[in-house]
Structure formats: structure tokens, C-alpha cells
């Protein structure tokens, strides 16, 4: 047994969708989460800047003696995951390959849509991974740069959010049977997205799919947390104001959590 925590990094609050799924599937694991909300969104930023910020988050998590790092951010995964994975001697997971694999299994007509930040979409990484595994699948990608600010400002139920989602996703309506939510912020807009595309379109949460891989690696490396750990405690950190982060996190995780502000 290994009672060290699992480290999660994201550009802000979006990675909490991955944490929520981990708490459901692996409730005995401890969590350290760092959200860089002060510099969110990452999507419009240059790749080199995203790489620099990601390494700062990684180094922060390493000071917390984590046993594994999860890139709970598609943009950071697209830009820096391979590099970080090769550099560290602990397991490092990203969210893109699990999401791509799940989309291939889910599609009924071979028409998959991918939505994400500008950087994730321009990298072409989802299309590359999907067509590497399933060359006949048709992939339609769409950048949704206005989605992350909606989530970070906790306006996911507002009329403005509905208007933006409807306008942005209009090009995909009637053209896909499966949609990858290629940003961990997007599941927080899941209800609106489903309403726009219709109930026939299957939505793939790349972060939730990633948790299945976390479980596999914990078993493979024999680093599962103890179910009898009486000192299990989660820690959440943000580079922005802790009040806003705490409100979003407590609502999404359905429990009151403590959030600490950090400067990287």
C-alpha cells in the first residue's frame, strides 16, 4: 500500500471534474490539486508559455511528495505531457488518449466531434490519436475559446452561457454521433451541450475516462492507497482567489472543501 497522494494539475477549476470521478471510483485515494486560475485559460497562450506554466505546477506537486501526477487539463496534455512523462520517475497520465479511445468505442456511425481550447484543437492531437487507432472514423474538430471563462466565472447556468454554447456548437448539429469534451472544464456545461446537440449524440468526458487508467496504473505499480488510512485528507490549491474556487469546487464535489492560495 502507498498512502502518498495523487497529484492533479489544471489551468483552473476544470480538473475538478476528474477529481469528482476519482472520488467516486477510488474513494480511498488522497488528492493534491493545483488549479492555475490566475493564468487561465491556457488555450490562447503560446505553447512555450503553457509548457513553462505546466512545469511550475508539476514542480509544486512534487514538493507534496505525490506518487502519481494526472494532467487534468487537455491543453497541458497536448503541449507538455510527453516531455514531463519522460522526465519523471513516477507515473504521469494525460486525458487525451483515454478520451480518444472512448470515442472510438462509442461512435455508431464513425462521425466523432471534438471540442476543446484553441491550443488543443490546433495541435490536432485528438484527430491524430483517433485516426491512428481507427483510420475510418471521421473527426470534426471545433475550438470553443469562450467556454472556459464561463466556467471559471461560475456562470454555467446563466442565459449568457446558454447563448454562447448554442452559437458555438451550431456547426456540429446533425453532423456527429459522438462528441469528445476535450477540455476538463466542459463537463460543467454538459447539460447545455447535450441540449444543443440532442440526446442521440454521445458525450465523452475525457477526464472521467482517465480515471479508469489511473486505477490500472495504481494496480500495476502496486501503489494503491490503503482503505484503512485514518489520516486521509485532500488538499486543494489555487493561484487565484480561494473564495471563488472554493464555491465552484464545493458545489461540484458536493462537499465543503478548504482551498489555499499559492503563488508559483
From Swiss-Prot:
Q: Where is the active site?
A: 73, 183
Molecular function via GO: glutamate racemase activity
Statement: the UniProt record of this protein carries the keyword Isomerase: yes
User: Please, one GO biological process term?
Assistant: regulation of cell shape
What InterPro entries does the database record attribute to this sequence?
Asp/Glu/hydantoin_racemase, Asp/Glu_race, Asp/Glu_racemase_AS_2, Glu_race
SUPFAM superfamilies hit by this protein: Aspartate/glutamate racemase (SSF53681)
Q: What class of enzyme is it?
A: isomerase
List its EC numbers: 5.1.1.3
Under PROSITE patterns, the record lists: ASP_GLU_RACEMASE_2
Kindly state which keywords UniProt assigns to this record, in alphabetical order.
Cell shape, Cell wall biogenesis/degradation, Isomerase, Peptidoglycan synthesis
- Asked whether the UniProt record includes Isomerase among its keywords, one would answer yes
Reaction(s) catalyzed by this protein? L-glutamate = D-glutamate
Under which pathway is this protein filed?
Cell wall biogenesis; peptidoglycan biosynthesis
Annotated binding of substrate, by residue: 10-11, 42-43, 74-75, 184-185
Kindly give the Pfam families that the UniProt entry links to this protein: Asp_Glu_race
Q: Which HAMAP family match?
A: Glu_racemase
Family recorded in the similarity comment = Belongs to the aspartate/glutamate racemases family.
Q: What does it do?
A: Provides the (R)-glutamate required for cell wall biosynthesis.
- Please report the name of this protein according to its UniProt entry: Glutamate racemase
Which gene underlies this protein?
A: murI
Amino acid at each position: 500500500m502507498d498512502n502518498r497522494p495523487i497529484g492533479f494539475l489544471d489551468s483552473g477549476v476544470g480538473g475538478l471534474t476528474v477529481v469528482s470521478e476519482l472520488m467516486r471510483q477510488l474513494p480511498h485515494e488522497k488528492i493534491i490539486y493545483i488549479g492555475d486560475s490566475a493564468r487561465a485559460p491556457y488555450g490562447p497562450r503560446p505553447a512555450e508559455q503553457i509548457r513553462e506554466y505546466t512545469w511550475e505546477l508539476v514542480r509544486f506537486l512534487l514538493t507534496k511528495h505525490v506518487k502519481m501526477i494526472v494532467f487534468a487539463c487537455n491543453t497541458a496534455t497536448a503541449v507538455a505531457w510527453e516531455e514531463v512523462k519522460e522526465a519523471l520517475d513516477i507515473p504521469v497520465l494525460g486525458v487525451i488518449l483515454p478520451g480518444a479511445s472512448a470515442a472510438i468505442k462509442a461512435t455508431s456511425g464513425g462521425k466523432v466531434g471534438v471540442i476543446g481550447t484553441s491550443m488543443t484543437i490546433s495541435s490536432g492531437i485528438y484527430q491524430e490519436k483517433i485516426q491512428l487507432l481507427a483510420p475510418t472514423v471521421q473527426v470534426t474538430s471545433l475550438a470553443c475559446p469562450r467556454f472556459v471563462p464561463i466556467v471559471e466565472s461560475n456562470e454555467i447556468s446563466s442565459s449568457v452561457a446558454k447563448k454562447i454554447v448554442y452559437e458555438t456548437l451550431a456547426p456540429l448539429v446533425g453532423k456527429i454521433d459522438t462528441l469528445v469534451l476535450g477540455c476538463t472544464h466542459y463537463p460543467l456545461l454538459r447539460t447545455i451541450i447535450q441540449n444543443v446537440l440532442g440526446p442521440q449524440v454521445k458525450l465523452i468526458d475525457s477526464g472521467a475516462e482517465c480515471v479508469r487508467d489511473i486505477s490500472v496504473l495504481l494496480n500495476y505499480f502496486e501503489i494503491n492507497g490503503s482503505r484503512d488510512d485514518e489520516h486521509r485528507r485532500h488538499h486543494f490549491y489555487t493561484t487565484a482567489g480561494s473564495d471563488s474556487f472554493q464555491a465552484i469546487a464545493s458545489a461540484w464535489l458536493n462537499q465543503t472543501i478548504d482551498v489555499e492560495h499559492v503563488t508559483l
